[in-house]
Amino acid sequence: MLELLQAVLLGAVQGLTEFLPVSSSGHLLLGQYFLGLDQDRFGLSFDVALHLGTLVAVVVFFRRDLLRMAGAFVRSLTRGRDLSEPDQRLAYLVLAATVPAALIGYLWEDFFETAVRSPWVVVFNLAFVGLLFLVAEAVGRKSRRAEKMGFAEAVGIGLAQAAALVPGVSRSGATITLGLLFGLRREEAARFSFLMSAPIIAGAGTLQLGEVLAEGMGAEQALMFAVGFLCSAVVGYLAIRFFISFVARYSLRAFAYYRFALAALVAALLLL
């Protein structure tokens, strides 16, 4: 029963913090350090379940955008590219943002998962990225749609996504911040951030799923897989819905202050 409750909690934490700009890896690392919550104990299959759950959350929430983009991409292959068409341009912008993140993640993920997994790294990045939120809110024009970005800007946001391999940075936080600095409206920066997360999550999940299927799952692993998947999917969907609605009306300052408070609390606990 205790393991089942931990699986529920880990799935909920993953779904919530994957899409809110507070760092999912940072919160999971802190949960492991202070509460003994360790998703590794459930094996690779549980990690795959969390990835697939958050992927389902993105796909379901943005299903109309993704269908339009997929259709536009197919048309570009059969009829030629027309990057003045918004859906086609957005599809290629997401592709341009995905490539650098995928390459860096593939080549350097093991390094980031071992060399920088320290609570003090999380403390620093929570505070530093919170400061970047305030800067982006102060200087960003917040007037453009995602489809109006240039491809160099999309690649830059892709590099920001790769930086989130470091615990405490936050994938959504880094990409949304850079989107604001590039002049995107808050809800557009969030929309682009979540859309570009889909191929990255799908790629990582697919690679891991192959290993899981090759190894097979016992009854207990299958139960934990189902629990992790459902919790991360449901909570992830609700987190996306909340955040898109929130940033349409409010700034990121509340999340910056949350990051500052959490960084201060964790630093105090580490020093005790």
Swiss-Prot record:
GO cellular component: plasma membrane
Parts of the chain that traverse the membrane: 42-62, 92-112, 120-140, 149-169, 194-214, 224-244, 252-272
Enzyme category, top tier: hydrolase
Lipid bilayer topology: Multi-pass membrane protein
Reactions that this protein is recorded to catalyse: di-trans,octa-cis-undecaprenyl diphosphate + H2O = di-trans,octa-cis-undecaprenyl phosphate + phosphate + H(+)
Protein location: Cell membrane
InterPro entries assigned: UppP
Enzyme nomenclature, EC number: 3.6.1.27
An individual GO BP term: cell wall organization
Keyword terms: Antibiotic resistance, Cell membrane, Cell shape, Cell wall biogenesis/degradation, Hydrolase, Membrane, Peptidoglycan synthesis, Transmembrane, Transmembrane helix
Task performed by this protein: Catalyzes the dephosphorylation of undecaprenyl diphosphate (UPP). Confers resistance to bacitracin.
Other noteworthy facts: Bacitracin is thought to be involved in the inhibition of peptidoglycan synthesis by sequestering undecaprenyl diphosphate, thereby reducing the pool of lipid carrier available.
Family: Belongs to the UppP family.
Name of the protein: Undecaprenyl-diphosphatase
Organism encoding this protein: Rubrobacter xylanophilus (strain DSM 9941 / JCM 11954 / NBRC 16129 / PRD-1)
Highest classification ranks of the organism: Bacteria, Bacillati, Actinomycetota, Rubrobacteria, Rubrobacterales
Gene designation: uppP
